[in-house]
């Protein structure tokens, strides 16, 4: 399975032929919620745009849309700096 990180709170696991999709919300300490989404409900609509300003949108058959923010990415030519020094 491939793990795709959306933000510091959401990540998704997608099967190789997306036969299963898991949405994981990490809470405080050991509190983790796993939500299983049937492949017929969203796998064919799963769109992931890497390196663009796009957000991630999942459409479910129940006509409910979940919108996840794009993870914080830094430009490739930008170096990490310590802002606390």
From Swiss-Prot:
GO terms for cellular component: chloroplast; plastid. It is found in: Plastid, Chloroplast. Keywords: Chloroplast, Plastid. Belongs to the ycf76 family. This is Uncharacterized protein ycf76. It comes from Oryza sativa subsp. indica (Rice).
